[in-house]
Structure formats: structure tokens, C-alpha cells
């Protein structure tokens, strides 16, 4: 054993057969097991355990020297590896060291042979793999259509991805995968190809990836891992039967003999206690986790009645654990989840990490269904109230609670699995999600999958560029679907009228969404869906999508700013107890199938007297006001209102505008920030500058000359000045000289007049979640309609 003693150290430590260097601190309070990439990390953990057994009061650290550690198996820590509150076990990088824990294996000594069409091949022995890197760069598994990072979803899709004419070219498609969005764009579906049938058609396995009875899209799909589709530079294919690895380099370049890394592991560190022996007091810090295999074919566990299927694994997994700290790490190039906090966990802190370029979710707090009373596992399932367990709250402690995700930078996630989130919470209690920056995600930035058991705090986050590859969702999304919930709304009204206590059997504590900045250009900024209940939403700056409240009970929404958008109330129940007060909205409400309007909708600021009048016509907003909010400096992200703003007269108060998102200087320097929208404001007659919308250049009809030229019976509507080629407006056959009179909603019977360009822009913003919008237009002195597909 190599024994490093600091000055004045007199006590000797003899540990037989230990090969790693052990440094003993001078005060006798700490010992460090120093490891390098050539050491066996599992043996290092054994040495740390021996040190702890020798002196349980001593702090133990496993300290990694700089380098890449290619693990052959995950590092699994159990209750025996626990530290104490005063002296936790630490897994950490040496000061200033760049330490990478990799789940990949190096492929060395490769002998490449030219094959055909610019493709080379080499033999690779060992287990199969589904991820391949060259010099740290992820390569593309052979696919159709070819990968283009600028195209969404999936880097490109094609309706003919699995057409019979294409399939006929495939000699051995077994092992291939069809990736598709669901037809309603609620998430992704993966379908394994098992081979060909007697008729030459594909034999397919079961669809994986989403907890709803849905069909895959006919058009938004691609196929991968098919040899015959290997036709682009940097594509590869591995034949697991013959062990040939095929690769297409740049033309005229032969592949290198080294520098290739194949995926091997799905997990890198697992903190695994048991119900009888929890692991506790462990810190993981300063490490980089990368190069893990995909897990999408294992994403098969339904998370109650949410839309999610889930895989309980990630680069770091914590289960049956207490007082765990995961801090200042980097997670990138992962095939699945980054951090999964599964089952019983208490006082887990996830702070200061950067998570990006991964296949699934960033951070997930997910309890076990055995902790849930009367659990159901699919949207359409229901149960009679007579059979419900009426005891409130959980029935066991197999769930995460009293934990925090704070100051994390999470971006470019969900590369493979589109039903994913920056932070996911399901079957958990009292989780705090604070000061995180989350952006460039395919679906929600933050998702709460069910009502069990509330008490969460979502605060000070910066969440934007969300719902980029799916639809009908938000930067923040939640479902309720608690034990009493039914998809039959009339049945729900009957149940709650008979026993109002049902609504808080699972959602036993209020969830707070406070002081966040959110922007969703393809859905809602905050989306409380399907029975989400017991929420307080206050002091949020919402930059694009507004707030949707569907079904549910006891939602208090107050003192929020909805830039260029509004409240979207959908199918509220009788006696819902909902409150919407002291908010700034910038267009009229967008109700759908509303027969009941909650406890109080009042004291709000509308942009125009017309919008306020529409609200009052429905029986709400008796004390609300209309007028410009008078934001101080929107271009510089300051949407505080001026001292003379009418917002102050309805009880709105300003909140801070400069402390959203990550706090750490390093992460703050790396984090992007959302683009600030220009508020839609009507200009004085004759003073309006043209603006851009959906590829059109538009302005309000505001002069007699414009009215006369277009043949309008009155001075109203929005004049189309120009249409950009290949834009959404161009595809809808809108033309220069058209006048847009109103937005028509075929499905729900709502429509909005668009007398000005500002009204058109705001009304369009309120409908982005639908994916299309129908305009009533005036062309050659006749009315017609145009359907525009929204980007």
C-alpha cells in the first residue's frame, strides 16, 4: 500500500492488499483514496469501505485524477458505503482535474476494408451496441431520411420511411427501429422491426414509449439501423450476427484505426439501498458522465395515468437513499436519462450540474406505484368511488420527498425520447425545483405527471424553447388524473358534487409555481391539464403561451404577466374553486366548452375595452380594467409596469425581473436566455408600422384609401402587404392584397375578430397550441377562408 501522510501525522494505518494511494489528512479527520484511469474503481470503493470500517467517524473521499475512466460495469454503492451527516462519503474530482466517467468501450486496432459506395467495414468482437462515437463525436446510426439537425422532429421525417417499395430493398431489417410521433403529437413511439413476413412485409414488435392508446403518425416518422439506408457521411451500421461494423467516412478518406468508442453501459453510478438498509450521506461532485447506451426500448413502465412510460435508470440512479448530494457535474452524450431519483429518497440535493445532449430526461423524481392508494395505470381506466381507498396521501414511503433540483443548466435533451422533460416529478412529495435554466426540449421543461402528493415548489426558473417536437403541452405541464378522476366529465361532476373531499385525497398539499420566466411558442407557458388540482400560480412572467387550466379544482392564479396571450380555461367543473385575479393579459380569454367559471375571475387588466367587454358578457371581471400595461423596457427583459400603469389599479404588484434561472457564475455564463417578445400594441391611426406574421407582412386597415382599395364595407381588418415564398402563409395560398377579418375556430365554435394587426397577432398566439389556424379573409370583395399550418 502507498501511504501518504501529511505533516504531524503520527497514527499509522495498515490496510492489507490495497493498491490505490491513500492520503491521510493531517488532523486525522479525513482520508482520501486517490485513483487514476488505470485503477480498478470497484476495488477503490472496497478500499474506501475498509477505511470507513476502520474509523466510522472519519470522512472518506474517493478522488479521481484527471482522465477518462471507461467503466466495465456501473459503480454500485450500497448501505455499507454510507457516510454520516458530519462525514459523508465523497466521490469527487481532484482539484482542477477533468474527470470523465464513460459508459463506452474503445475500439482499437481496427482493420478497415473498402466495401462499396464509399462504405468501409471492419470486424468488431464483443457485445452488440447501439451508439458509436469517433473522437468524442456521436455518429449517426444508418437511417432514412438522413439526419439533419436543423429539421424537427427527429432530425428529419418522411412518410415513406417504411413503405413497401422501400422495405423491398432491405434484406435483413431485423433489429431496425421505426421512430414516430404519435398521431396527435403527444410523444414518440418506437416500434422494433423483427424481420419480414412471408409476404415480404415487415414483422413488427409492440409499440413502446407512450402511455396512451394512440397510433403512430403516418408522416412524422423515420427508420434506423437498416444497412441499406447507410448512404450518408458519418453513418454506421453494426451487424450483430456477423460482427461487421460498417461506416461511411468523407469521400476519399479511409477510417482511422483508433478513436472509435462503442456504447457499453446504460448506467454509471447506482446508489442502491434497500428498505431495510438505506444508503445515506453520499456526495458525487465534479465529474463528467457520458457515452451511455440508449434505453428507449426499456421505457415500458407506465407512470400512473400520465402519458408517460418510463425507464428507472440513468447515468446516476438513487434508490432507497437519504441525504444524497449530486453537485457540479456534467452529463452529456447519454443515451437515456441523466439522474433518476427512484422510490424512497429523502433530502436529495441536485445542484449546479449541466445536463445536455442526452436521449431522454434530465432529472426525474419518480416514486413507486405501490406507494399510491387505489392506483390506476392508463388514461381510460377508472374505478367506482365505492371501491376507492379513502385515506388521504401515500400508503408507503416508497417515493421521493423533501428534495431539491437547484441551479442546474438543462438543455438539448430528449434527443430520442420525446415524452421527456428537463425535470420530471411523479408520485413524489415536496420537491423543490428552483433557479434552473431549461431550454431546447421536445416537450415540457418541467412536468408533474400526477397529483400525488403535491407540496412542490417550482420557483425562479427560466424555461423556454419548449414543445419543439410535439404538441398540446407547455413549458410547465401537469396532469392530475388522481384516484377519483374519470375522463367522463359528467361522471366527474357527479362524483365531486357527492363528495368534494375526493379532490384532495392525492393532492394533499398545494403545489406552488412562483416567479418563473417561461416561454412556449408551440403551446402554453403553463399547462395544467386533466384534473390538475390544488395549485398556487403567482408572480410569473409568461412570454408567449399564456396559462391553460383544464378541469381540476382549487387553482389560484394571481399576479402573473401573460405577454401577448391570456387565460385558456377549458371545461371547468361546477364548484371548481378556481380563482384568477390581479393578472395582466394581452388578449381576451380563450374558453373551450365552459359552463362554469370558478369562484372568482376578477381584478385583471385587459388590453382593450372590447376584450374586457367580452369577458363581462360571460359574467366575469366586474372590477377588471382595460388599457396598456406600460411595461418599462420589454426589449431588455424588464416587463415591470410603470408607476402610471392601470395594472396597479387592479391590485397587480411588480416582481423582480433579473433573477430567473441558474445562479452559479460558470453556468450563468453558459446559459442562453429567451428572446424577448415585442408586446402587441395597437398604434395610433396612421402611425402603424408593418409587422411580420407567419411569413406575411401585415398592417391594420387604418385609412379610407386602404378601405377603398380593398373594397371593404368598413374600416376594419388586417391588410396583407406581402407573402414570403415557401412560408406558412404562402402554403395556405394567402396573397398580397388579402384582408384578414377574423380567426375562425371550427372545432369549438369560438372566433375572434381581427380588426387590427395587434389583435390578429394576439389571437394567433392564443391558438399556436393547435398547430393550425383558420382565417376568414376578404379577397376581391368576397369572403373565404384559409387554413394555415403553424410552424
State where each predicted segment sits:
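Extracellular polysaccharide-degrading/modifying enzymes targeting complex plant/algal/animal polysaccharides
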Residues: 32-330, 371-395, 637-638, 648-682
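Short glycine/acidic-rich loop motifs that flank beta-strands on beta-rich extracellular proteins
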Residues: 73-74, 293-299, 335-341, 359-366, ...
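Right-handed parallel beta-helix
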Residues: 280-291, 322-336, 346-360, 372-391, ...
Amino acid at each position: 500500500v502507498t501511504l501518504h501522510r501529511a505533516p504531524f501525522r503520527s497514527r499509522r494505518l495498515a490496510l492489507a492488499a490495497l493498491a490505490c494511494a491513500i492520503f491521510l489528512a493531517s488532523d486525522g479527520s479525513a482520508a482520501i483514496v486517490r485513483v487514476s484511469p488505470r485503477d480498478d474503481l470497484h476495488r477503490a470503493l472496497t478500499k474506501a469501505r475498509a477505511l470507513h470500517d476502520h474509523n466510522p467517524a472519519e470522512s472518506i473521499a474517493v478522488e479521481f485524477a484527471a482522465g477518462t475512466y471507461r467503466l466495465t460495469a456501473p459503480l454500485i454503492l450500497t448501505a455499507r458505503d454510507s457516510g454520516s451527516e458530519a462525514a459523508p462519503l465523497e466521490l469527487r474530482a481532484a482539484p482542477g482535474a477533468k474527470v470523465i466517467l464513460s459508459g463506452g468501450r474503445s475500439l482499437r486496432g481496427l482493420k478497415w476494408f473498402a466495401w462499396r459506395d464509399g462504405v468501409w467495414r471492419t470486424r468488431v468482437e464483443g457485445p452488440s451496441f447501439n451508439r458509436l462515437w469517433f473522437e468524442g463525436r456521436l455518429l449517426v446510426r444508418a437511417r432514412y431520411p438522413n439526419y439533419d439537425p436543423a429539421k424537427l422532429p427527429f432530425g428529419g421525417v418522411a412518410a415513406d420511411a417504411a413503405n413497401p417499395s422501400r422495405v423491398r430493398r432491405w434484406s435483413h431489417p431485423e433489429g431496425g427501429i421505426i421512430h414516430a410521433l404519435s398521431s396527435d403529437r403527444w410523444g414518440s413511439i418506437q416500434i422494433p422491426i423483427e424481420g419480414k413476413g412471408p409476404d415480404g412485409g415487415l414483422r413488427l414488435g409492440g409499440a413502446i414509449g407512450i402511455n396512451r392508446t394512440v397510433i403512430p403518425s403516418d408522416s412524422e416518422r423515420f427508420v434506423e439501423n437498416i444497412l441499406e439506408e447507410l448512404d450518408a457521411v458519418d453513418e454506421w451500421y453494426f451487424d450483430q450476427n456477423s460482427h461487421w461494423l460498417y461506416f461511411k467516412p468523407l469521400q476519399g478518406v479511409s477510417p482511422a484505426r483508433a478513436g472509435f468508442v462503442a456504447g457499453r453501459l446504460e448506467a454509471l453510478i447506482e446508489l442502491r439501498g434497500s428498505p431495510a438498509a438505506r444508503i445515506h450521506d453520499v456526495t458525487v461532485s465534479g465529474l463528467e458522465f457520458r457515452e451511455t447506451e440508449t434505453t428507449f426500448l426499456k421505457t415500458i413502465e407506465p407512470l400512473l395515468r400520465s402519458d408517460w412510460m418510463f425507464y428507472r435508470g440513468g447515468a446516476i440512479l438513487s434508490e432507497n437513499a437519504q441525504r444524497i448530494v449530486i453537485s457540479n457535474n456534467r452529463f452529456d452524450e447519454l443515451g437515456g436519462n441523466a439522474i433518476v431519483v427512484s422510490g424512497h429518497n429523502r433530502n436529495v440535493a441536485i445542484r449546479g450540474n449541466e445536463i445536455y445532449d442526452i436521449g431522454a430526461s434530465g432529472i426525474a423524481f419518480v416514486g413507486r406505484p405501490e406507494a399510491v392508494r387505489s392506483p390506476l395505470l392508463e388514461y381510460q381506466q377508472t374505478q367506482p368511488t365505492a371501491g376507492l381507498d379513502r385515506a388521504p396521501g401515500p400508503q408507503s414511503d416508497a417515493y421521493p420527498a423533501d428534495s431539491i433540483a437547484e441551479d442546474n443548466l438543462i438543455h438539448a435533451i430528449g434527443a430520442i425520447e420525446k415524452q421527456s422533460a428537463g425535470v420530471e416529478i411523479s408520485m413524489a412529495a415536496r420537491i423543490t425545483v428552483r433557479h434552473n435554466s431549461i431550454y431546447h426540449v421536445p416537450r415540457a421543461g418541467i412536468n408533474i405527471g400526477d397529483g400525488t402528493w403535491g407540496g412542490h415548489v417550482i420557483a425562479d426558473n427560466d424555461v423556454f424553447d419548449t414543445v419543439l417536437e410535439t404538441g398540446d403541452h407547455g413549458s410547465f405541464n401537469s396532469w392530475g388524473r388522481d384516484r377519483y378522476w374519470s375522463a367522463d366529465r359528467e361522471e366527474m361532476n357527479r362524483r365531486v358534487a357527492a363528495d368534494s373531499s375526493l379532490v384532495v385525497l392525492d393532492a394533499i398539499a398545494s403545489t406552488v409555481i412562483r416567479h418563473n420566466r417561461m416561454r412556449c411558442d408551440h403551446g402554453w407557458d403553463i399547462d395544467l391539464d386533466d384534473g390538475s388540482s390544488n395549485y398556487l400560480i403567482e408572480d410569473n412572467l409568461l412570454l408567449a403561451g399564456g396559462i391553460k387550466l383544464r378541469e381540476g379544482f382549487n387553482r389560484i392564479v394571481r399576479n402573473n404577466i401573460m405577454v401577448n396571450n391570456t387565460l385558456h380555461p377549458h371545461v371547468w367543473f361546477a364548484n371548481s374553486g378556481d380563482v384568477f385575479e390581479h393578472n395582466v393579459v394581452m388578449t381576451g380569454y380563450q374558453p373551450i366548452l365552459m359552463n362554469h367559471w370558478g369562484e372568482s375571475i376578477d381584478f385583471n387588466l385587459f388590453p382593450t375595452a372590447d376584450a374586457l367587454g367580452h369577458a363581462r358578457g360571460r359574467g366575469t371581471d366586474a372590477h377588471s380594467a382595460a388599457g396598456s400595461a406600460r411595461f418599462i423596457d420589454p426589449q431588455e427583459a424588464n416587463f415591470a409596469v410603470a408607476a402610471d400603469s392601470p395594472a396597479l389599479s387592479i391590485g397587480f404588484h411588480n416582481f423582480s425581473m433579473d433573477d430567473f434561472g441558474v445562479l452559479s457564475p460558470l453556468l450563468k455564463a453558459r446559459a442562453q436566455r429567451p428572446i424577448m417578445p415585442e408586446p402587441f400594441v395597437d398604434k395610433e391611426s396612421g402611425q402603424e408600422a408593418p409587422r411580420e406574421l407567419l411569413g406575411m407582412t401585415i398592417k391594420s386597415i387604418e385609412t379610407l384609401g386602404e378601405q377603398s382599395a380593398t373594397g371593404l364595407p368598413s374600416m376594419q381588418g388586417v391588410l396583407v402587404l406581402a407573402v414570403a415564398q415557401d412560408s406558412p402563409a404562402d402554403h395556405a395560398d394567402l396573397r398580397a392584397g388579402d384582408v384578414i377579418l377574423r380567426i375562425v375556430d371550427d372545432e369549438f365554435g369560438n372566433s375572434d375578430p381581427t380588426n387590427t394587426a395587434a389583435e390578429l397577432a394576439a389571437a394567433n398566439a392564443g391558438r399556436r397550441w393547435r398547430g393550425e389556424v383558420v382565417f376568414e379573409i376578404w379577397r376581391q370583395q368576397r369572403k373565404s377562408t384559409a387554413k394555415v399550418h403553424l410552424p
